[in-house]
Amino acid sequence: PNGFVKFIRSIFGYRKTSLTLFVILTYVAVLLLAYLDHSLYYSVDLPTSHKEQELLHQAWVDLQHIAKYEHAYGSSGNDYVHDYLESRIVSAVAHKSYVEYDNDLNYTNNIMFGSRSELSGNSFNSVSYYESNNLVVRINGTDETLPALLLSAHFDSVPSSFGVTDDGMGIASLLGVLYYYTGKSTARPRRTIVLNFNNDEEFGLYGATSFLSHPWATGVHYFLNLEGTGAGGKAILFRGTDYGITKYFKGVRYPYGTSIFQQGFNNHLIHSETDYKIYKEKGGLRGLDVAFYKPRDLYHTAGDNIKNIDIKSLWHMLSNALDFTAIVTKGKIDLDADSLDSESSKSNTDTAVYTSFLNFFFAFPTSQVVVASILLLVLIPGISIPFLIIIFGYKKNWELSFVNVTKFPISLAISAALLNLFTNGFIVPFNQFLPNSSPFALVAILFATFLLLNYLILNGINLIFVSYKIVNHDEKLISIIETSFLYWVVLIYSTAKLANNVIGDDHSGEFPIIFLCALQAVASIFGLIGWSFKPVPKEHYVVVPQEEAEPLLGSSDNFNYGSPDVEDDRLVSDGSYDWSIQFLTIVPISTYLIYNSGFLVVDGINKSIQESLISQNLIYKLLQTFAISLSIPLLPFIFKVNRLFVLALFLISTIGVLFVATADSFNVANPLKLRFIQYIDLDKSAQDSFVSVIGREASPLQFVLSDIPSVKDSKGAVACVPTRDGLQDCSYKSSLDPKLVPGAKSFDDYLKVDILKNSSSNVDYPFGLLTGEIRIRVPKNRECVLDFKPSESTKIVSPFKDSPVKTVIVYKGKKSATTKEVEAESIPEGFSKDKDGNYVYKDLVGIDQLQLNKLDWDKSYHVGFQWVPNFSDVDINMKKSATNKLNVSVKCFWAELGKGEESTIPAYEELLHYSPNYVSWANSAKGLVSVSKTVEL
């Protein structure tokens, strides 16, 4: 018995070795739990039932076919995928009479719409014309009164990618759902299900937008959007429109998500968008956005291929789609009868706060989270203050000094400042892109450095003021209380923001603060209870040996820090070990919450350091915040860690310095991502083409291009110019011309612009609208962009900042000889069709750009414009014709990639072949080749 008691005392006594053991076990447990939670292999099981195995097998076969070629909207690979999907859909729907199929390829669902954005403080209005070939399936439910559920994914890729994750797995999952509900053993669902296999998401979210004009969109109230903004791994719940629909994600078998990502999207920290935006903002639907989210350096590159994907990733998305669909369609849900007057309906419209842990899903409305936060904010001081009054007002048994109270916040502030200096003064200058390859190594270095700094500063202060010490001051409890107050203040701010949660100022991902604050408060109150019951001190103090533990529910820390452990019988005679209760209350759970949140954020966005300087600055701030936050739960106990732990911190920091100086930022597993386009400017030359590559400044971009054979053979220079936000554009004249138009003798054959109508009569000038009309002839093409601006000569006298173009017209076919020019005032604002079925869009503020997307490879674009002449008083009298002119810049894109001898873009193939293995390639625009020409009307 004595040996057992001695063992327990040696483990749980407040000793350096005991504390260090607790710390090590805590970090091992946290890392292990987080790994199990985030691991695809340990958290997702492949199906065991024969039916689901068959579904997964067929979906995997479908994915292999989808990813056979790059399949951007402007490539023949897109037609291949469309036709393959159509054949699979037609085969599946033939089994059930209540399943319908429609193909937008019949030109019944073409759309035209405008979108306004802010560029450099100026309003920019773009109008898009899009010819849809969505594949839409409707599985009619038995209860026609129930609103329908939409499942959506897009079947196009970017030109540089095979689109396995983005969004082949989403499409394969939709096919899996279709196979399930058209299978012989599956009963007809009660709720109607609509499946939208949409096209051209990548450069305008066009497929989702066109679906809203489809007749089957009527009656749809809910949606599940399946996406990919990474390349494999687990599919995460990015965001939900509200709590009402998000809570149903709890029923899927492998839920994975956190509202931290939702906060990032809603606050525009993540710049890429998905079809979710269209369904929510334009369609007014309620739904979820489920997507793969990492790694970003393979996203939109050739690395997003079938070789880099695990079948478990597909099953994770497919199983979640099957489960969510089954939950929503098996009968009525409370959202079907939502009334704004009911309390449940009000909470259903709240933003959702959600997270998952080991396949358990937790979701709450923001209103409930706010109430819980307010209750906690009231309870903490309400309980703590009476104990403080008892301790300092009645018993007066806790004597504090200014040094005791201020040393922890001083240490925290100095350590944070030094850590920032270390980051921005050493890491960034020596290896600024290191977060791309080693984000968690940096977190470990910063974490160890921050702990070490606090250990040295706190114990240094103790050493300086050792002669002024008060024996029973309990610096551990002081640090716990001060940390609790810090969390309390942060929770006030977060709660105030969450109570008024809006898009652009979303705080739904800050829920861990509630738990951190509560845990810290419990530990501090526990310590205050101990002091409240501690006897009033005698007239003199007795110094207690360092290795003795604290009295029952109290503490008697001394300043012999740094002294060796005394491995003898001098343990606590009264058997109290309340420090362990405080440690177990604070450190394990707090550390997991902070690590899990930080891991997800860093793992999701660290690759975006290659996208901009703003992203780089954000990532380094997040790394420092992560390291500091991860340290805080341990800081109240940092006084007591033993020498070996301190030595480990020192070694990590020291080795970290060498690591930062020598580690590679880019490697095979974490490549440098560069963006390519080959461009021809016919205004300058019909014979020359240039390659433009965009990447980060100070990256190996210029070195990579200088080593390409055609560049060295031509002895041409690679010219690099800074563009925006830490990016640079490096270009060189290419000797490898694209081969996209058979029989073309020069690049003039790629793009011809015929001016059909140069202007209207000047009868009403300068007070009437001028009109112009052009035909754009571009063989083997689907995508062109027109930019409008006044003529250079007009700019001198123009008093207007807005675009002069007020109306654009896309002619459906050959213009009728009897067609009369439509009077401007008779055209309604926004989109309309004239009597001949031509597509018309009018915006009196001005139209800066027209984006054209068509399906017929060889059909010409036929476009008309109406614009306001620019004039001044001088112009009215002199009627200078120069002020009537309009420049129309036409740029057309090609995305067709051949292989080997049939290579259509040899300059791109050369870069793929000769670049170092640490480089991955993506497109920088709609296509991989662009040809431009400017005409003046």
UniProtKB/Swiss-Prot annotation:
**What membrane topology was assigned to this protein in its record?**
Multi-pass membrane protein
The record's listing under Pfam families reads: Peptidase_M28, PFF1_C, PFF1_TM
Catalytic residues (positions): E201
Gene Ontology biological process terms in this record: proteolysis
Please give an example of a GO cellular component term from this record: vacuolar membrane
Transmembrane domains' residue ranges: 17-37, 374-394, 408-428, 438-458, 476-496, 511-531, 581-601, 619-639, 644-664
Instruction: Identify the residue position(s) of the site Transition state stabilizer.
Output: Y299
Which residues hold Zn(2+) 2?
A: D166, E202, H300
Q: Origin, by domain of life?
A: Eukaryota
Give binding positions for Zn(2+) 1. H154, D166, E227
Give a yes or no for keyword Transmembrane in this entry. Answer: yes
InterPro entries found in the cross-reference section: Fxna-like_M28_dom, M28_fam, Peptidase_M28, PFF1_C, PFF1_TM
User: Could you say which cofactors this protein requires?
Assistant: Zn(2+)
What is the UniProt remark on how the cofactor binds and its stoichiometry? Binds 2 Zn(2+) ions per subunit.
Q: Where in or outside the cell is it found?
A: Vacuole membrane
Positions glycosylated per UniProt: N106, N140, N606, N758, N870, N887
The record's GO molecular-function terms, alphabetically, read: metal ion binding; metalloexopeptidase activity
Which stretches are Cytoplasmic in the membrane topology?
A: 1-16, 395-407, 459-475, 532-580, 640-643
Keywords assigned by UniProt, alphabetized: Glycoprotein, Hydrolase, Membrane, Metal-binding, Metalloprotease, Protease, Transmembrane, Transmembrane helix, Vacuole, Zinc
Q: Which family does it belong to?
A: Belongs to the peptidase M28 family.
Q: What does this protein do?
A: May be involved in vacuolar sorting and osmoregulation.
Quote the protein name from its UniProt record.
Vacuolar membrane protease
Q: Which organism is it from?
A: Scheffersomyces stipitis (strain ATCC 58785 / CBS 6054 / NBRC 10063 / NRRL Y-11545)
Starting at the broadest rank, the lineage of the source organism is:
Eukaryota, Fungi, Dikarya, Ascomycota, Saccharomycotina
